[in-house]
């Protein structure tokens, strides 16, 4: 039996869980107050605070660090890598602390795991990090040579969904062609073929607008805004990725509240319908690049809990193929199972430095 500690930081909380083989034994969402977090300039600076919270959880559930066979951590913004399970080592930790191109809370997980596990010789791993890049060559072109499209997505949940759906079909991930739409505070819509994410919108910069992100914007207007604005580049980036989308239009990040408002507000109705329209359009594009009719179109993520909203999307896309809805995220299970496959010898863990060099 393998006992695995799972660590998955979010913007204002850290999800932690204990698995014994495939079975989840304990789970908790460790919340961090805005007052606590605002003391830190960068996400990575929160590491001691969040590590202490994880240590307290371990004590609370009656374990010691040395009781674990391994630690599974959410993968941060690393250099582009193929999907898989990667060993957390000093090189990866240094990259996440000092060289990651994006200041994101996901960068914390591997650092926390390494500082917890290394003194006791506990192996630590990340699974399908945010920067999984398996895009086909054609998908990389942006329109100008100086800019290449980047693959930043909700890869962990997307890969978990791919495994789940293919297993239900009695096939391997390499044998199916599916489109996955992960709908959360950010949106990733991708085409999966031969077990790989061959195309995906960058969840920060492209695709549909979401709960708090603008998605793709007209280039001319972005340039005009940047040069006529008194805001810094960092402030504009925050405007586009944390203050855009549904929040900018309706002043709320609560999709359910926005859906309820549709009954009395024409504006709310139009905004929510526009978001569904843009998601459906992105799904249609991904269906096209698969080359064949998809085996399934999967809608997942937090927004997939809202049946009314899912229906708006499926009205557009059901003509393209079978639609399956998997609400929420499979991230904790995906992290544990990715590490379990390595511990059982079913899959070989990858060395991050070797892969990128």
Curated annotation (Swiss-Prot):
Keyword Chloroplast in record: no
GO BP: any one term: acetate metabolic process
Enzyme class, UniProt record, top EC level: transferase
Keywords, comma-separated and alphabetical: ATP-binding, Cytoplasm, Kinase, Nucleotide-binding, Transferase
EC number(s) stated in the UniProt entry for this protein: 2.7.2.7
Disulfide-bond pairs as recorded: none
Reactions the enzyme catalyzes: butanoate + ATP = butanoyl phosphate + ADP
Cellular location(s): Cytoplasm
GO cellular component: cytoplasm
InterPro entries listed in its UniProt record: Aliphatic_acid_kin_short-chain, Aliphatic_acid_kinase_CS, ATPase_NBD, Butyrate_kin
Keyword Transferase (UniProt): yes
PROSITE patterns (alphabetical): ACETATE_KINASE_1, ACETATE_KINASE_2
Coiled coil: none
GO molecular function, one term: butyrate kinase activity
Similarity section: Belongs to the acetokinase family.
Listed name of the protein: Probable butyrate kinase
Source organism of this protein record: Thermotoga petrophila (strain ATCC BAA-488 / DSM 13995 / JCM 10881 / RKU-1)
Gene name of this polypeptide: buk
């Amino acid at each position: 039996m393998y006992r695995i500690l799972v660590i998955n930081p979010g913007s204002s909380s850290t999800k932690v869980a204990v698995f014994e083989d495939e079975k989840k034994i304990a789970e908790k969402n460790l919340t961090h107050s805005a007052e606590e977090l605002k003391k830190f300039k960068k996400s990575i600076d929160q590491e001691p605070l969040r590590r202490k919270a994880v240590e307290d959880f371990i004590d609370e559930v009656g374990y010691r660090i040395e009781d674990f066979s391994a630690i599974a951590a959410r993968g941060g913004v690393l250099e582009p890598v193929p999907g898989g399970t990667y060993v957390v080592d000093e090189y990866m930790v240094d990259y996440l602390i000092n060289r990651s191109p994006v200041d994101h809370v996901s960068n914390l997980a591997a650092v926390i795991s390494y500082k917890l596990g290394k003194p006791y010789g506990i192996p630590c791993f990340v699974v399908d990090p945010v920067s999984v890049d398996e895009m086909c060559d054609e998908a990389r072109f942006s329109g100008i040579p100086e800019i290449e499209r980047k693959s930043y997505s909700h890869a962990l949940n997307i890969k978990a969904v791919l495994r789940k759906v293919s297993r239900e079909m009695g096939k391997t991930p390499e044998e199916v062609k599916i489109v996955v739409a992960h709908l959360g505070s950010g949106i990733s819509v991708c085409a999966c073929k031969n077990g790989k994410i061959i195309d995906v919108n960058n969840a920060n910069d492209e695709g549909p607008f979401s709960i708090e992100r603008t998605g793709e914007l007209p280039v001319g207007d972005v340039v005009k805004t940047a040069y006529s604005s008194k805001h810094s580049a960092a402030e504009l980036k925050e405007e586009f990725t944390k203050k855009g989308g549904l929040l900018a239009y309706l002043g709320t990040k609560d999709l359910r509240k926005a859906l309820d408002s549709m009954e009395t507000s024409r504006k709310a109705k139009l905004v929510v319908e526009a978001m569904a329209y843009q998601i459906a359009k992105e799904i249609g594009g991904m269906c096209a690049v698969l080359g064949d009719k998809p085996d399934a179109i999967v809608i997942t993520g937090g927004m997939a809990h809202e049946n009314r909203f899912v229906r708006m999307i499926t009205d557009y896309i059901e003509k393209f193929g079978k639609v399956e809805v998997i609400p929420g995220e499979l991230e904790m299970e995906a992290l544990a199972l990715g590490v379990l496959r390595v511990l059982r010898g079913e899959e070989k863990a990858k060395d991050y430095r070797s892969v990128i060099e």
